């Protein structure tokens, strides 16, 4: 579980619409363990402070930032009976302030431009992380050490009640999604009652209600000591500097009591069991789960290879059988979820409408038996190896965040006692044979699965939301092991914490790779930013099309046609395309946004030539075969049906036509998926016409970032695109009309029975992304609802505790763009929450205007985040894409700092008045109308209508 969800805000250039035993105190260990697999290595230095805190340091000086990743070796698996959800609740409390720095934890980090800031809890660990400018490292370490060593005096009943409410709404939000209750059911039936993994991390409402301040103190004292903690610093730092700073800030924190370490217990089952769950879903889903070898076990990487062969994509056994051949399901996947005590091997299949799930299970059983008998082929294994290697290499570009190098090192150290343990898994994957994978599969996957079938609830029937009964207590649980006795001692601190958080007055400058331009021999313009940190090249072909090009056509044409590109060329079918992509380690994808359609390539430098040949064939020569069209059509219709069971999907489908009118280019479902009627009527002529009119060289810009040069990439692109000629017919001109804004508020209610939360979405029209005062509009939005400490979020989440989060955001657009507010709130506070949204909207342009302090906060946050915002090749490509789409100059990013600094209060206030229209909002509220309709009507927000998920007014 993460502390808060990623913001829905559009970034610049993007479009929005997700144990070692204690070593000697002075010893430092530099990268031991096996030789790098295929050259993959994350060099590190490890040392232990006298108080037992483990430190791992990795140097990466490509950007002036340092990732700080702190892992406490405690998670939901350590919760005693009656305390489920407490580890995650405590994670939230860690953001409530500390004894020497009261108030929300985020403010100092926002002021220095921190990125990738969050906290998460899982079965075996709780982690907190952020990436900060190098000059702000002292501030970050002071903050982390203050809450680690000085928390309890800052946590009272108010803080506990606030975060309890936030967590309970996080639980409601998760359960308010289709299939949102499956994890709880699967865990309860996969593991015995005395297994640490039998309950999910979010916990039960009753246990969360029962959490007390005494529990907080006990948990902190038991688990948040220095000797139970690993800190990884990765980025622009040296081991010497890291040691000095960690000793300064953390050296006086007590080691804490020894923590009994739970031992691996797979609890594999001997017999197959079944369960059924009814939910508000559009189609039946079959989930099968096996308990398998834990992280670090020699079989775990082999099972990942087996999962890829069985259900890793279009080339996999089950996809071939169930989707292509028998046409029984719309999708099927298989994955391993690795954990410290046991892993889960999970199959998920979404059954086609009208198909008997029994037939699906029979086909799965046949493929399963065949795999257990024969194992994978040599080619299946090679494809899996390449995919694994390429994916790992791509992850090495980022120092922090959810999955960067700091996370790899921390996970290896915390779970396996060695920061380089990941190399063992890479080596096992490289050394695997069909025989070893088959043997591992037979050891773990031949018996003992739990099958959960999730079926659509009948209309008018209530779902059973009672907690699953689950398995009883079982024998065989290994005893916990105490760590080796160690003589830890905290040092006397010389740090005066009463002086407050260290001030940061110096900040690094932005370094953005130069944008180089070229032209292919047929006139196609290319833009390149070189980035040689990893051997990867990313590319985007940007076509002026998008959802807006559906105007006058069947809705969903652009998205559907783009989705068909990699389903077959004149010489290759979809399986062969997928097979070649896997062997090359390449990722090719195509899709549409509001104003553009694109085809993207992420390729290894060593395989770029062959990857480009495949890429060009997909773009230039789509086959649009009837069989592929029908297969994708079935999946597409299933996706639309799923959208109409999801609160967010319902709102994003219905709001745009209300804002723009249903004849406008933007008056369409913002999911881009169209309607059932339009998708059913699409034929090959429609798709070929779209491709002929929009996917053409005179409507194209090629954008590249990564490990290449302008001369080299121009030569390679000329080879595959240089002879591409446009037809004589001109590119159609999209008509994006200006819309008169509504003059009064309107409210549209959509019924979703049994919903534990209501989704409140408001919309109004704002100026185009291309307007001169876009920066002022974005600053205003950051203050109102676009950051964690924004007015909306602090009100509904931190003050009222009615929502897991509340935000406002602008959907980037060439024409007028929608300005939206979003909050998913507990059902019994729907009307009150809507009133608060309206109050905040009125206040920011009325009696509580934007302050100098708020402006300074957003300015500082955005300016100081710039140096760390372009660490990855993908983020650089995002700027090239945004520049091309919105006609920005090449130095757009380099001049952002000056333009941000130059904003005036008057201009930002004017932006607020131009965008925020509290008394002319269009409200879409999705929830249980039996409970919310009367209170919402009583608010008198505006004219109230009830409509269905298709936007049809019912009354």
Over which residues does each language-model region extend?
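Proteolytic maturation boundary segments
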Residues: 10-56, 238-278, 284-285, 289, ...
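A common structural junction motif
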Residues: 145-155, 249-257, 365-376, 617-624, ...
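Bacterial N-terminal signal peptides
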Residues: 1-8
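Non-catalytic, conformational "gating/processing" segments within enzyme and secreted inhibitor domains
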Residues: 157, 164, 217-249, 449, ...
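Metal-associated gating/positioning segment near the N- to mid-region
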Residues: 93-100, 104
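Alpha-helical scaffold elements lining the catalytic groove of polysaccharide deacetylases
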Residues: 207-216, 679-682, 687
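Short, conserved secondary-structure transition motifs
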Residues: 166-174, 265-277, 385-396, 603, ...
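M16 family metallopeptidases and their MPP-like homologs
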Residues: 56-58, 63-81, 85-89, 103-150, ...
């Amino acid at each position: 579980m993460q502390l808060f969800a990623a913001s829905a805000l559009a970034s610049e250039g993007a479009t929005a619409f997700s144990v070692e035993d204690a070593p000697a105190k002075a010893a430092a260990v530099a990268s031991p363990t096996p030789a790098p697999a295929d050259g993959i290595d994350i060099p590190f230095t490890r040392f232990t402070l006298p108080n037992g805190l483990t430190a791992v340091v990795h140097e990466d000086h490509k950007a002036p930032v340092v990732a700080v990743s702190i892992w406490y070796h405690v998670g939901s698996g350590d919760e005693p009976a009656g305390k489920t959800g407490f580890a995650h609740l405590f994670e939230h409390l860690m953001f409530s302030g500390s004894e020497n720095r009261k108030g929300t934890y985020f403010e100092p980090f926002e002021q220095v431009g921190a990125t990738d800031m969050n906290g998460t809890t899982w079965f075996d660990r709780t982690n907190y992380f952020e990436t900060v400018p190098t000059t702000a490292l002292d501030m970050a370490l002071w903050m982390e050490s203050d809450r680690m060593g000085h928390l309890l005096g800052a946590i009272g009943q108010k803080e506990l009640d606030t975060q309890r409410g936030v967590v309970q709404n996080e639980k409601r939000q998760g359960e308010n999604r289709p299939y949102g209750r499956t994890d709880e059911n699967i865990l309860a039936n996969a593991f015995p009652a005395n297994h640490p993994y039998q309950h999910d991390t979010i916990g039960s409402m009753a246990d969360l209600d029962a959490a007390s301040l005494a529990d907080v103190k006990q948990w902190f004292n038991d688990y948040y000591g220095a000797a139970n903690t690993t800190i990884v610093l990765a980025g622009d730092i040296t081991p010497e500097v890291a040691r000095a700073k960690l000793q300064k800030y953390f050296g006086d924190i007590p080691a804490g009591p020894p923590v009994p370490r739970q031992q691996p217990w797979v609890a594999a089952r001997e017999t197959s069991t079944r369960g059924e769950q009814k939910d508000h879903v559009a189609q039946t889903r079959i989930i099968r789960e096996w308990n398998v070898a834990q992280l670090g076990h020699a079989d775990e990487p082999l099972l990942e290879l087996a999962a890829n062969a069985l259900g890793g994509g279009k080339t996999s056994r089950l996809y071939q059988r169930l989707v292509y051949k028998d046409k029984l399901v719309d999708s099927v996947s298989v994955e391993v979820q690795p954990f410290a005590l046991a892993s889960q091997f999970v199959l998920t299949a979404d059954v086609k409408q009208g198909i008997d799930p029994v037939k699906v299970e029979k086909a799965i059983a046949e493929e399963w038996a065949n795999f257990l008998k024969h194992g994978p082929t040599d080619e299946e294994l090679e494809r899996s190896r390449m995919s694994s290697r390429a994916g790992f290499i791509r992850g090495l570009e980022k120092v922090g965040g959810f999955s960067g190098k700091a996370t790899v090192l921390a996970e290896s150290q915390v779970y396996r006692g060695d920061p380089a343990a990941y190399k063992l898994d890479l080596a096992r994957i490289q050394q695997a044979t069909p025989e070893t994978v088959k043997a591992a599969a037979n050891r773990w996957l031949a018996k003992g699965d739990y099958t959960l079938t999730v079926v659509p609830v009948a209309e008018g029937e209530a779902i059973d939301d009672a907690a699953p009964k689950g398995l009883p207590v079982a024998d065989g649980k290994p005893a916990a092991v105490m760590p080796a006795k160690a003589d830890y001692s905290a040092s006397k601190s010389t740090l005066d914490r009463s002086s407050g958080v260290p001030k940061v007055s110096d900040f690094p400058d932005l370094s953005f790779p130069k944008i180089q331009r070229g032209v292919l021999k047929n006139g196609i313009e290319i833009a390149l930013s070189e980035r040689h940190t990893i051997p990867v090249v990313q590319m985007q072909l940007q076509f002026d099309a998008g959802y807006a090009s559906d105007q006058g056509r069947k809705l969903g044409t652009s998205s559907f046609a783009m989705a068909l590109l990699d389903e077959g060329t004149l010489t290759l079918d979809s399986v062969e395309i997928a097979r070649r992509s896997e062997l090359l380690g390449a990722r090719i994808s195509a899709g549409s946004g509001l104003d553009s359609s694109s085809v993207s390539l992420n390729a290894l430098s060593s395989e770029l030539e062959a990857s480009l040949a495949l890429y060009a064939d997909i773009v230039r020569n789509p086959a649009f075969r009837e069989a592929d069209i029908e297969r994708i059509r079935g999946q597409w219709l299933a996706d639309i049906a799923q959208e109409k069971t999801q609160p967010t999907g319902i709102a994003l489908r219905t709001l745009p036509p209300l804002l723009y009118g249903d004849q406008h280019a933007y008056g369409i479902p913002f999911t881009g998926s169209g309607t059932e009627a339009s998708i059913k009527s699409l034929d090959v002529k429609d798709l070929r016409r779209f491709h002929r009119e929009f996917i053409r060289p005179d409507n194209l810009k090629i954008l590249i970032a990564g490990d290449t040069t302008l001369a080299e990439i121009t030569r390679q692109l000329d080879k595959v695109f240089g002879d591409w000629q446009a037809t004589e017919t001109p590119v159609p001109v999209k008509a994006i009309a200006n819309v008169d804004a509504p003059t009064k508020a309107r409210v549209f209610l959509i019924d979703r029975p049994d919903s534990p939360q209501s989704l409140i979405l408001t919309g109004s029209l704002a100026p185009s992304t291309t307007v001169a005062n876009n920066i002022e509009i974005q600053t205003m939005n950051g203050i109102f609802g676009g950051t964690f400490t924004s007015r909306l979020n602090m009100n509904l989440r931190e003050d009222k505790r009615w929502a897991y989060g509340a935000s406002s955001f602008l959907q980037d657009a060439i024409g007028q763009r929608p300005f939206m507010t979003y909050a998913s709130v507990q059902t019994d506070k729907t009307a009150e929450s809507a009133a608060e949204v309206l109050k905040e909207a009125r206040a920011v342009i009325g009696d509580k205007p934007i302050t100098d302090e708020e402006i300074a906060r957003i300015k500082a946050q955005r300016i100081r985040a710039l140096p760390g915002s372009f660490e990855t090749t993908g983020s650089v490509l995002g700027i090239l894409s945004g520049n091309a789409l919105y006609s920005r100059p090449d130095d757009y990013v380099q001049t952002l700092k000056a333009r941000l600094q130059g904003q005036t209060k008057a201009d930002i206030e004017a932006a607020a008045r131009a965008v925020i229209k509290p008394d002319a909002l269009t409200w879409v509220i999705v929830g249980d109308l039996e409970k919310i309709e009367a209170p919402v009507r009583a608010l008198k927000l505006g004219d109230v209508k009830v409509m269905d998920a298709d936007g049809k007014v019912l009354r």
